[in-house]
Amino acid sequence: MTTIESKEEQAVGQDIAVTIVDTDVHPLPVSPEVLRSYAPAEWKDKLWPTGNAVSPVPHFYDTPDSYKTMSLRVDAAPPGGGVAGSDPDFAAKQLLVDAGVSIALLEPMCDAQLPHAEHVLKGTYNDWLANVWLGENNWHGRWRGALSVTAQDPELAAREIERWAGHPYMAEVLMTPQTRGIPFGSPHFDPMYEAAARHGLPVATHLMGQTPFELIPIYPVGNPAHWHDFFASWPLLYVSHLMSLVFDGAFDRHPELRVVFVEGGFTWAMPVMWRMDRIWEQRKADLPHVRRKPSEYVREHVRFTTQPLEEVDVGTYRRYIEMMDLGGNLMFSTDYPHWSYDSPDWAIKRFPPDQRERIMRGNATALYRLPSTVKALPGEHGDVAV
């Protein structure tokens, strides 16, 4: 494994072409105390009353060592100590140098039950992310951050967006899909959508949580008992939100809004688009505000990250992508440093050759307005930009 030199010895290399953009990476704090140091004084003990920022025991069966690893790759733990995903330089060594990722989007996982508590917690994470990952540890300029906001109070979310608008490395807004019964297309979210669209920031959603009751959504038949139940059911949330975004008119109210569904895969989107198109054709009189086919809204406004990829052959993926013309809507992701990580070398072979460039790089580069070249890290061998 290649070693990145200390900051004092780092020399930024030549320009190399951006070939892989990872749209789902999870940075973690070294300890709860680190986060506490960024929280307002009156909230420190309220947010971490026991000194633990994560649930101390697994709340459904995950992996055999989930209690010890928090579902993280054991080999991603920094040699100097700490949990996987807590050391920016070691993450850069594994993800940027060894795995060949050119630019990675960092999405912290944090949530809270009460609206104002959630707002404060998200703001705390934003301050930590900006300082620890997007500050001096982003000397290479290859980390991008997700700006976390509360879904429960969109006015506070809009305020947080305004606080970070213009930051050179904050690339998107991040919210939970666990919205307590309010679908994404509801006007409830309009203040947040308006602020995000005005500043050209896509709104991403990723399941998250601080406690067992927040992490696991309640499905029609109750809570999942095992990790595979949970993971297979995850897209159910996204199906509901996607239909609401289209049928409840969010994209008509906010023509510049872009939404990213993270870590739910994408194969579920095709049958949903078919069904929405059929309903729209049959019941246009009931949907006068939906001016185009629902599938057209999806192609223009929605992106899906690829992880977790189903292990099917290239021909199957080609048929899926071509059926609803979704090649321009998929963005590669690894889910580093979780054990469910999809490596770039493995994933790229699943995509049709003529779709690989835009899935691995092009779609994300366009959405997040990323550069076409980056500076090579020590030990990295990329395609030299000309």
Give the label of every model feature segment.
Residues R73-G81, K93-P115, R142-S148, A171-M175:
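Divalent metal-dependent hydrolysis catalytic cores, especially in the metallo-beta-lactamase
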Residues A117-H119:
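Internal helix-loop-helix
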Residues S31-E33, M109, L215, F261, ...:
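Hydrophobic alpha-helical membrane-insertion segments
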Residues V25, V101, E107-C110, S148, ...:
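Short, well-ordered beta-to-alpha junction loops that form the rim of enzyme active sites
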Residues T2-V21, P29-D98, S102, D127, ...:
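Mid-to-C-terminal alpha-helical segments outside catalytic/metal-binding sites
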Residues C110-L114, R180, W339, P344:
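A short, flexible beta-alpha/helix-coil linker loop
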Residues T3, L134-N137, R142-W143, V149, ...:
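Catalytic pocket-lining loop regions of alpha/beta-barrel enzymes
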